[in-house]
Every structure is written in C-alpha cells, then in structure tokens.
Design a protein with these regions (language model features):
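Bacterial N-terminal signal peptides
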Residues: 4-16
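N-terminal helix-cap/turn-to-beta initiation motif at the start of protein domains
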Residues: 19-29
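Short beta-strand segments that buttress and anchor functional surface loops
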Residues: 33-36, 84-91, 112-120
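Short, solvent-exposed loop/hinge segments that bridge or flank secondary-structure elements
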Residues: 34-70, 153-156, 160
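Short, cysteine-centered beta-strand-loop-beta hairpins and adjacent loop/turn segments enriched
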Residues: 38-42, 91-96, 118-125, 139
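Hydrophobic/aromatic beta-strand elements that line small-molecule binding cavities or substrate pockets
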Residues: 48-50, 72-75, 97-104, 114-118, ...
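Mid-chain, structured segments of secreted extracytoplasmic proteins
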Residues: 61-105
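Intrinsically disordered, low-complexity terminal/linker regions enriched in Pro/Ser/Gly
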Residues: 150, 156-183
C-alpha cells in the first residue's frame, strides 16, 4: 500500500515556478524534511532526505507539495525573508491549486506550510500540512543532486525525471508564465 505522502511524491515532477521573484536557494548538500498534516489527520509525520545543489534545489524544495507536475501558473512573493508561493497545476486533468508559505535561513533550517485544493475530489488529500527542513551535511555516498529518499527507503531521481519530461515533444517548462498553457 502506498502511503499518502509517498503517492504525492511519486507524482511530483515539480517545476520551479516562473515569476519575477525566485524561490529561496538552500545550502547544497543533504536535507531532511519532516512533513506532518495539521489537525486530526491520519497521516503521521514522515521524513524524506533530499540531496541538493544549485541546479536541483528549486525542484526539490517544492517536491513535498502534492500535485506540482504540469504547472501552468505560478507566483512567488518575498517579503522580509518570508515567501508566499501559489501554483496552478494539473494531475491527470485534475486542477490543483497550491498555496505554500516558506521562511527560515535556508542555509541550516527552514519551515513552511502548504494547502492544496483539487478541482475534483481525490482519495488522499492531506489538507493543511506543515514541513520543516534541516541541513544534515554532505550528501551520503551514492546520492546525487536531485535524489530524494522516501520514508520507505525508495530513492527517486526527481531531477532526472524532470529532464526526461522536458525531453518529450511539445513539452514547455512554463517559463513563459503559462502563456501557452492548457489543461
């Protein structure tokens, strides 16, 4: 059985949001990100590990947020070290509106909160969710930048999957702000 977070991470081929401002960049190396739903959710805290560098961090930073594949719109606003990110993405033709808030030093630790709304009901919607990241040091042997290790020990090569997706005919990374977007 696939856990809700694992399912969300499996479908996540997150694109760095386009916009006037950029996502914060975390210190390169190994990050542990603890994710836990707010309230009375049945989803317990889960932890993933991410190996980052400057070229993969924007993808991995948003990788804990469900439904960030095939994004058509995004906005990033930064104010006094706090980031407010909004995306409109599609998963199997189901519109996903995400709101993400981030804050922290991004060199040793950060925290955030996300909430996603689906146009059509889905089986596992975690509801409002908090996450905290902390830098652990250098990536472990065998890990490459862009790798994410799930709670069950499975390693996803997020950056590699993104590259494969970009290589497909007709794919646009939406750097045009979604001007050529369509469901």
């Amino acid at each position: 059985m696939i856990r809700p977070l694992s399912f969300c991470l499996l479908i996540c081929l997150c694109l760095p949001p386009a916009g006037a401002q950029s996502l914060p960049v975390r210190k390169p190396g190994l990050w542990e990100v603890a994710v836990r739903a707010e309230g009375d959710s049945l989803v317990r805290q889960q932890k993933v590990q991410q190996c980052t560098d400057a070229g993969t961090d924007a993808v991995l930073l948003m990788a804990v947020v469900p439904g960030q594949a095939d994004c058509h719109e995004s906005s990033i606003r930064e104010r006094e070290g706090r980031y407010d990110v909004r995306t409109v993405c599609y998963v199997h033709d189901n519109r996903v509106d995400a709101h993400v808030q981030l804050s922290g030093s991004f060199s040793t630790a950060y925290e955030g909160r996300f909430d996603v709304k689906y146009a059509r009901p889905v089986r596992h919607n975690p509801g409002p969710t908090r996450f905290e990241g902390r830098w652990l040091g250098a990536c472990t042997a065998g890990m490459r930048p862009g790798d994410m290790v799930l709670p069950n020990g499975v390693t996803l090569r997020i950056a590699q999957r993104r590259g494969q997706r970009e290589g497909r005919e007709g794919y646009s990374p939406r750097g045009d702000g979604g001007a050529n977007a369509g469901p």
